[in-house]
From Swiss-Prot:
It is found in: Plastid, Chloroplast. This is Large ribosomal subunit protein bL36c. Its main location: plastid. One of its GO terms (cellular component) is ribosome. Belongs to the bacterial ribosomal protein bL36 family. One of its GO terms (biological process) is translation. SUPFAM superfamilies: Ribosomal protein L36. HAMAP family: Ribosomal_bL36. Keywords: Chloroplast, Plastid, Ribonucleoprotein, Ribosomal protein. PANTHER family: 50S RIBOSOMAL PROTEIN L36, CHLOROPLASTIC (PTHR42888), LARGE RIBOSOMAL SUBUNIT PROTEIN BL36C (PTHR42888:SF1). The keyword Lipid biosynthesis does not apply. One of its GO terms (molecular function) is structural constituent of ribosome. The keyword Chloroplast applies.
Amino acid sequence: MKVRPSVRKICDKCCLIRRHRKLLVICSNPKHKQRQG
């Protein structure tokens, strides 16, 4: 999980999800997991 000030989709399988006022990127590739913080 990477924590970044700005999250974005890296590939086509990445999807942006909003949970508890946090933006998350979830993907089949575990390297693409991101969280905004």
